[in-house]
């Protein structure tokens, strides 16, 4: 792992710049020469060709496919390790697995720990053993820095920076690790499909869909008009409109999430918060930029998202009950 690179955990823009810098520095690192000579380059070129093919099919940037492929190879190792029961997947990687990578691009991996101390030493030891598991995929991993996450005190935890190597290709990875989240009613075992072969799957523990939705909606309500993450709105919308879920379990999960994050009082005025979000010009502009950036969001109007949130939170039902009855 190149010296002089430390995880920047505050500003997301700085975090992105850090990964770009890391990738640039890694470009100059020489890996041991392959005993097969030119075969080494052909392996790298073959992987890039497969990635470009998937990228064209799904209309996703090739770098996103590469990043997710390397995460996949790490998760396959996790599923074969003694730590399979101790890491629970959540966040964007899980949403992408549920709705499909062509419907949700992600560049990060989020997990919560179960029955494992949330300390740098424990995290490093676990990842070291996971990364040491050998598969016939040509991928290897190097653990870099493990630093406290300071961007949001509600979550806490640590951010791990790794390098994934495939021949001459190096890919920086970022993993957020936290603990103590309220998973309502409990985590579930989920089968993840591999990128290059849908019929190949690996099993890991993950948040149930109602808890995923609850965390997104709590974040939307808590951040209100100060939200700078349009993906929160997209995730809540795409999960609510494409997946089966239990409304009662979602409501319980939302309450449990708010209690755990100590935000129940802060978000109790749901109609007022949603009204502010609905009328906020900055959020509307932010959403329009997101629609232009990601083709999978292009057909979703801001008003549609607001309407789905109102339905999820019972506002539409309340409005219907309170609507005045008129004579016909």
Where are these regions (language model features)?
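Cationic, low-complexity basic patches in intrinsically disordered or flexible, solvent-exposed regions
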Residues: 15-21, 31
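Structured mid-to-C-terminal alpha-helical surface segments
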Residues: 35-87, 96-105, 109-328
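Hydrophobic alpha-helical membrane context
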Residues: 18, 25-26, 120, 244
